[in-house]
Amino acid sequence: VGHHFTQGTTDSNEVWLEVTLKSGDRSLGASGLMGPDGSVDEWSHFVNNFMLDKNGNRIDRRNAQDIFVPLYQHQIPPGSGQTVHYSFRLPDDVSEPLQVKVRLLYRKFDSTYMQYVDQKTAELGRPIRGHQQGQPWRNELPILVVAEDSVVFPIAGGAAVENAPREIPEWQRWNDYGIGMLLKGKAELRQAMEAFRRVEELGRYDGPLNLARALVEEAGPGQLDEAAAALQRAAAHSDPAAPPWTVAWLSGVINRQQGRLADAETNFRQVTEERTEEMVRRKFDFSRDYIVLNLLGQTIFDRAQQIRGSDDAAKEKRLARLQEAVEVFRRTLQIDSENVDAHYNLAQLYQQLGAAEQAAVHQQAHEKYKIDDTARGLGVIDAHRDHPCLARTCCA
């Protein structure tokens, strides 16, 4: 798909993981089961986002006007993956192999939203067909199995087990696993790196390319040099070749962090200005990628700051570069008029260009659109109070 999964009405789409554990005919545990009313256990892992209003209440009935901040975002980006960790304790008397089955399930509307619909349709005199007023609502909307898999684990001292070979290539499974951990942020970067090293051992460019991303994300001592080396190994692949636009973007990020601003500017211009045959065929247009545009604008801004000298030639060159950076950030605002980074940099640029009035406009916009971390924290505290399960499941 060309968008996040799930997309659209994410306040009510219900996508969740159902996990069951068995040993022989004995059920040992489960997550993601439904109650008698058809609602899913709130301690389950949901593939959605959990939006809050200013009071920490969930946005759950199409009240988009009240959206304030996400508590978590579990949507899966295009071509990406997601990892979820489960822990369990086996009874001491288990002797048969452990069977674990996982299903990703989809239902168009969750029970919270359908209860709201049921209430409103009853008030309008048009109750939902089949529901007797005064009886508890049961969510009987159809459930689709998006994907499922199972694995069998041996028990110490028990019989050996053999799992059927997977149709999905091993490198792809390692790569997806690594991407899922990479997207979790700092907490699981080391595990992501190990997964990407396995991908590289299996002969795919994705391994060193994504390893470079993880190293840049962590950016400890010497890791930028290691990231640059990994990126060179990825670029050396030819069958298949690493996407040149991704290589250029990561090269720019690394060069920028290492102070090689001229090289970084060249890299970012490659991403936003070049159009290869493959990009045209696949309808890729990175000239509208405002993340890269902002990186380009910041790099030009930094290079302008490096121009020294008080003679007219130096002043003219510096002003020209500052104006060039302005134009790049204005391109970002044509795409995203509320882009905080663009407004912040434009405020700084116009200040240096002596345009105080324009600087003030963008300073005000930056203050208006930037995230209020204090208010966000209060909303999250309220949400955790009302939904204790979220303290664990929002970061699972």
Indicate where each model-derived feature is located:
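Short, conserved sequence motifs used for protein processing/export or organelle targeting and
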Residues: 1-180
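Structural marker of alpha-solenoid helical repeat scaffolds
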Residues: 201-202, 237-240, 274, 285, ...
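TPR/TPR-like (Sel1-like) alpha-helical repeat modules
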Residues: 268-274, 340, 344-375
